[in-house]
Curated annotation (Swiss-Prot):
The gene is rsmE. One of its GO terms (biological process) is rRNA base methylation. It catalyses: uridine(1498) in 16S rRNA + S-adenosyl-L-methionine = N(3)-methyluridine(1498) in 16S rRNA + S-adenosyl-L-homocysteine + H(+). Coiled coil: none annotated. This is Ribosomal RNA small subunit methyltransferase E. Specifically methylates the N3 position of the uracil ring of uridine 1498 (m3U1498) in 16S rRNA. Acts on the fully assembled 30S ribosomal subunit. Its EC number is 2.1.1.193. The keyword Cell inner membrane does not apply. One of its GO terms (cellular component) is cytoplasm. Belongs to the RNA methyltransferase RsmE family. It is found in: Cytoplasm. Gene3D superfamilies: 3.40.1280.10, Hypothetical PUA domain-like, domain 1.
Amino acid sequence: MRIPRIYHPISLENQTQCYLSEDAANHVARVLRMTEGEQLELFDGSNHIYPAKIIESNKKSVKVEILGRELADKESHLKIHLGQVISRGERMEFTIQKSVELGVNVITPLWSERCGVKLDAERMDKKIQQWQKIAIAACEQCGRNIVPEIRPLMKLQDWCAENDGALKLNLHPRAHYSIKTLPTIPAGGVRLLIGSEGGLSAQEIAQTEQQGFTEILLGKRVLRTETASLAAISALQICFGDLGE
C-alpha cells in the first residue's frame, strides 16, 4: 500500500513531533482510518519530505513523530505562471488540479470582459481558498513538495501589465508562431494567458500586444479553455521543461 502524503502548512524543520492540521487530521483519521503506528509522508512546501509515524490518533486530532528529513525535488526547471480567466462550474477546479500536476508554479484567476462567472468578494475569497486546497491535494497526489500559489482574483489588464522578467504568451487561433518556434525561455520563465470560453475581446487583445505578449498557435483546432491551458502547459514542458526527461 502506498504511504499517504500529507501537506503540513508550518515548517517541519527541526521538529520531532507535531499535530496535523485540522483538515489533514480529519482526512487521516476519518477518511483513511489510520491509527497509531502507521506511516505517513509529510511535506511543508520547502521541497523536503518528512517520513513520519502516527503516535496519537482520535476523532479530533492526529499527532505524529517525525522520523527524518530528505530533499525531494520534483520541480521543473521551467517556471510557469498561469493567468486563467475563471470559467464556469468545475472547469476551473479541473484546470487548477491538472495544471499543478503538470508543474505550474503560480496560478492567478482573472476576470475579463467576456467572463461568464459573477461572484461577490466574499464568495470569491471562499473560491480562492477552495482552489488552494485543490492545489494542495494535487501536490499530495503527484509528489510535488512545493505548493503552487493561487493568487487573488485580478483584472486581466492588471495582470498583463505586471512585469517579472517572464516571456509573455497568449494563445490565439490566428497566430503566426507556435510553441516550437519560440526562442530560448528567459530565467523568469513563462507567463501564460488563457482566456474564457468566449475568448478575449478586441480591446483585451490590443492590451496584450501593448504589454509585450507574443501570440502563439496551438494546432489547427479550437480548444475549450480548460483544454487549451493544459495543452499549452504540456507543450511548454515538453519543449522547455521536464516532460520526457
